[in-house]
Amino acid sequence: MSNINFIPEIPLTWLTCPIYAEGVLLPKRNESSPDRYSDGKVPFGRAWKEELTVNDSALMIEREPDKFKAIGVFTGQKSDGLVIFDVDRNLGVIEKKWGKDLKKAPKVTSLRKNAAKFLFKVPQDLVTEVASISQTAAGQEGWEVLWGGQGVIAVSYTHLTLPTKA
């Protein structure tokens, strides 16, 4: 049995995916596909089509602890309007620029310096107006917006911090 205590409370309206552990040989797409190994961020492939709740993903992680070491959440309409503001560098500058808004959001931190994810919910009447923004489109400022994809939110080196109520 594994220790799945690293999984935070995740709303049941969010769809999730177990994440392959770093170094795990990934399933082949077809017979002629070359071997590929996980970098620790690769979601369980069938999760893109299946609707896995946090309980489903936790059970998979518990049953195969050497294969899956993290949990991700899908963003966009399939997770009730969840959007992730993903900061890979320049966290201090970004928090200074948008600190007031970021302080209100749940925050996923990691041991990587200057990196965090901030989680927001888009109102239902605005979900058709949201799109992902890549690092390139963001002017290489160190952030991107995840919408319609997935983001890893909990592994042994990350944790989710909920904002304090003012």
What are these regions (language model features)?
Residues 161-166:
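A short, hydrophobic C-terminal helix/tail in secreted or cell-surface proteins
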Residues 1-160:
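Conserved phosphate/metal-binding and DNA-contacting active-site motifs used
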